[in-house]
């Protein structure tokens, strides 16, 4: 077996003790924050009524259910958008605090989101593939371990972004996503 290394700030270090399982030779282990832009949401001050409106959906953990997002519960004005965190369609939202930790969904539009949600906007990888990894027992368990055993588990963006994920070649990502769709379609017929 070959060893696994990462190079950060010009320093190479062995990460064998972090590798949870073997992956095919043409796959790589990668930190979540290396495959896209990560951010944590925020809530514009409600004392500024001009921030509220109907221009852009404002998402909270309660709006994420079973991999879907309810977009019409709250919204911000154009001015509110300027003080909020914004992500584009194809970004993956994941609740990172409390009993809902790990709930996630892919947005199909530009949105703003609150501080209980971390987002990754994938670059050069398939969003649906990364979403599938983030829903896996491996990833959810890793999140909860990093969140600690407090009464209210929480994982900050730095720890969340440092979680390792297995990344396959892009063509394989699309094949995996398509196969997963086929299987889920068959399951819904049962």
Predicted feature descriptions by range:
Residues 1-11:
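Extended, domain-scale alpha-helical bundle/helix-rich regions
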Residues 12-18, 33-48, 62-89:
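Sequence-specific dsDNA recognition surfaces
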Residues 13-42, 166-178, 182-190:
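Non-catalytic DNA-recognition/assembly elements of restriction-modification systems
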Residues 39, 94, 115-116, 140, ...:
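Glutamine-centric residue-chemistry signal
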Residues 43-47, 64-75, 89-113, 128-132, ...:
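Short, ligand-facing micro-motifs at secondary-structure edges
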């Amino acid at each position: 077996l070959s060893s696994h290394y990462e190079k950060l700030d010009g320093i190479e270090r062995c990460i064998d003790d972090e590798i949870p399982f073997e992956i095919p030779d043409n796959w790589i282990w990668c930190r979540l924050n290396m495959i896209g832009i990560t951010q944590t949401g925020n809530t514009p001050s409600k004392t500024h009524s001009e921030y509220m409106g109907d221009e852009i959906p404002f998402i909270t953990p309660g709006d994420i259910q079973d991999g879907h997002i309810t977009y019409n519960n709250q919204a911000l004005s154009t001015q509110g958008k300027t003080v909020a965190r914004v992500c584009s369609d194809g970004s993956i939202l994941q609740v990172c605090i409390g009993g809902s930790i790990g709930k996630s969904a892919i947005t199909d539009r530009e949105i703003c989101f609150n501080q209980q949600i971390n987002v990754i906007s994938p670059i050069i990888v398939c969003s649906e593939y990364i979403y599938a990894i983030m829903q896996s027992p491996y990833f959810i368990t890793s999140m909860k371990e990093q969140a600690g055993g407090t009464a209210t588990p929480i994982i900050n963006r730095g720890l969340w972004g440092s979680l390792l994920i297995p990344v396959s070649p892009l063509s394989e990502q699309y094949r995996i996503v398509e196969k997963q769709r086929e299987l889920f379609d068959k399951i819904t017929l049962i």
